């Protein structure tokens, strides 16, 4: 028989629950609030068959465009050929979670605001742009208790 091309084909490991995360779904999953414009990650929960997105969208990040009682509409851009296609996927809340992709940026914004406020109080200017890491500073290596060792490759020998 030819193999199946079903909607859940080849998802044996993709839709697995995590280690020590089997059983009842946590109540916190249902208590999270989603608003239009929130950035969410789609992570399929194999224990809930209702409102499950297609396997392509598992692991994708999108923006919430619609909120209902038990599900959210997520806007995702899919690469098709040489273009991005806008896809609107309706997913139950068991299969989405808030994304942490902007967390680093938001933390940096808060830190920059604190630096700016402190500098303004002192009457100084502050550099808020990120700078690339400079090269290591020049230094001398002492050979007093650190004798140089010459390394040679080991000759290849066939053993039968």
Curated annotation (Swiss-Prot):
PROSITE patterns linked: RIBOSOMAL_L21E (PS01171)
First-listed, main subcellular location of the protein, grouped into a coarse class: cytoplasm
A GO BP entry: cytoplasmic translation
Cytoplasm keyword on record: yes
Chain spans, region Disordered: 114-140
Top-rank lineage group of the source organism: Eukaryota
Matching Pfam families: Ribosomal_L21e
InterPro entries, sorted: Ribosomal_eL21, Ribosomal_eL21_CS, Ribosomal_eL21_sf, Translation_prot_SH3-like_sf
Annotated family: Belongs to the eukaryotic ribosomal protein eL21 family.
Misc note: There are 2 genes for eL21 in S.pombe.
Complex and partners: Component of the large ribosomal subunit (LSU). Mature yeast ribosomes consist of a small (40S) and a large (60S) subunit. The 40S small subunit contains 1 molecule of ribosomal RNA (18S rRNA) and at least 33 different proteins. The large 60S subunit contains 3 rRNA molecules (25S, 5.8S and 5S rRNA) and at least 46 different proteins.
Protein name: Large ribosomal subunit protein eL21B
Gene designation per UniProt: rpl2102
